[in-house]
Regions:
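Extended surface/linker regions that mediate inter-domain or inter-protein docking
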Residues: 1-183
Length: 183
């Protein structure tokens, strides 16, 4: 996982932009990787007696590319955003510019923890289930970040937690899971 701020480093190429990552692909990398992006445009709006900064948030594009696979393998569809939106209505996180559940898995990958001092898994499949069960968990679910502590212990899922199809698609919750999935 590499996180880079593009800022003024992108180069216009006609109606597109190019950017060369500083982080190299690890020499032992295998399979397929995904490149994704988040962004927003900030515009100052003059309302006559005051000005304010408005933000227009971009979609979260993702592109899989093959490292050693013959063809790029896309991330599997586990949950559909439309199902999230049926409860959350315009779900946006981390400054409102992350709003696609598949995109979330780009950073919230296996073996990802919040901070080293008080490690709590933020792997998407672990984290999302714990958040939705918050109030039912014996010890709750608290995530400590550099920007603050987030306590999900009071979250009550309004549906039936046994109804996996309320969120999952394509029988993605069915066991046994495929052997080639990340832990």
């Amino acid at each position: 996982y590499a996180d880079e701020t593009v800022g003024g480093s992108a180069v216009p190429m006609g109606d597109h932009w190019t950017y060369t990552f500083e982080a190299a692909i690890p020499e032992d990398a295998e399979g397929s990787f995904t490149v994704s992006m988040e962004g927003r445009i900030e515009v100052e709006v003059d309302y006559g007696n005051e000005t304010d900064t408005e933000r227009d948030y971009a979609e979260n594009p993702m592109m899989a590319f093959a490292v050693t696979d013959t063809e790029a393998v896309e991330r599997r569809m586990v949950v559909d955003d439309a199902k999230c939106e049926s409860c959350h209505v315009n779900l946006r996180l981390h400054g409102s510019n992350r709003h696609d559940v598949t995109y979330c898995s780009t950073c919230h990958a296996a073996n990802t923890v919040d901070i080293a001092d008080v490690p709590e898994s933020v792997h998407m499949k672990w984290m999302i289930h714990k958040i939705h069960r918050g109030a039912e968990l014996e010890n709750g679910y608290i995530v400590v970040r550099s920007r603050g502590t987030y306590d999900f212990s009071n979250i009550h899922y309004t549906g039936d937690l046994r109804n996996c199809d309320a969120c999952h698609v394509n029988n993605s919750q069915q066991l046994p899971l495929a052997d080639n999935l990340l832990p």
